[in-house]
Amino acid sequence: MKIKSLIKFLLLILFFIFPYALHAKKIPNLIGTWEGENIKSSVKKGFVRSNNIVEITEQKSRVFRGFVIHKSGKEKFVGVIKSNNKDFFWADSSDDDGKVIGTILNKETIETCYLDSGRDAVAGCSILKKIK
């Protein structure tokens, strides 16, 4: 009789816990190389289109780091995924005060938008595909 009661109790617990486990959101893995076209408007350079390459090299839970590849070299950044597991932000290591606001569109696609205010204002966005 005790075994039947124990089984019923365990089934009852599973009945209440299992639905929560199904709906728990998994933190997306952003590690990899991302590439795509960047479109931007700049006070100094006007409207510009260019290729954008981002490599995310490390991730622990929702925080990550990596670099953007420019013509002049690599620029390091650090970032964080918001608790909704869809939106993220990063700050680069340059002396400007620009920031990136991003959205995870799916496992293979992210959108990043860069904003920098001031005398040399820049606003631009990229749709980046994971290439490796």
Predicted ranges, named:
Residues 5, 24-26, 66:
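N-terminal Sec-dependent export signals
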Residues 1-10:
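Bacterial N-terminal signal peptides that target proteins for export
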Residues 36-48, 53, 80-132:
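Beta-sheet ligand-binding and adhesion/scaffold domains
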Residues 45-82:
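N-terminal glycine/threonine-rich, aromatic-flanked beta-hairpin/loop signature
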Residues 21-35, 58-59, 131-132:
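N-terminal helix-cap/turn-to-beta initiation motif at the start of protein domains
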Residues 10-18:
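Bacterial N-terminal signal peptides
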Residues 28, 73-75, 120:
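Residue-level signal for glycine
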